[in-house]
């Protein structure tokens, strides 16, 4: 099982994109080099979409840093099938909690946190 992190924004400014690359590099993935937009890393190798595949501990650290920077929003595909968007107004440690989700917690978060959007991905192939 692996986890995908998708960072999205309607407009991804150059400095924000560069900051993302620096953060990801700190967490042990390869730098995509200058001019590459929305880099995608699978097991440390650069791909072409706007997702990152990282180990869970790296994701927790990355999401905390991203949220603390006050960026637009975070998408974290958890255990392949759950997509959770965590907005900057919630910085109370919920990010780490979301990385340990199960079905009951998904329902609880959806009911109690209006800034959490959850959708189910059924078409993600773990072998891709």
Model-derived features: positions:
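Acidic (Asp/Glu-rich) sequence patches and key acidic residues
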Residues: 1-128
């Amino acid at each position: 099982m692996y986890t995908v992190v998708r960072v999205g924004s309607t407009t991804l400014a150059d400095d924000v994109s560069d900051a993302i690359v620096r953060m990801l590099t700190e967490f042990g993935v390869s730098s995509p080099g200058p001019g590459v937009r929305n880099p995608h890393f699978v097991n440390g190798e650069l791909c072409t979409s706007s997702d990152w595949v990282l180990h869970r501990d790296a994701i927790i650290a990355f999401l905390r840093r991203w949220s603390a920077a006050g960026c637009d929003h975070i998408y974290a595909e958890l255990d392949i099938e759950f997509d959770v968007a965590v907005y900057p107004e919630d910085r109370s440690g919920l990010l780490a909690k979301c990385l340990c989700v199960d079905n009951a917690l998904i329902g609880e978060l959806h009911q109690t946190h209006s800034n959490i959007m959850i959708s189910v991905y059924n078409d993600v192939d773990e072998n891709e």
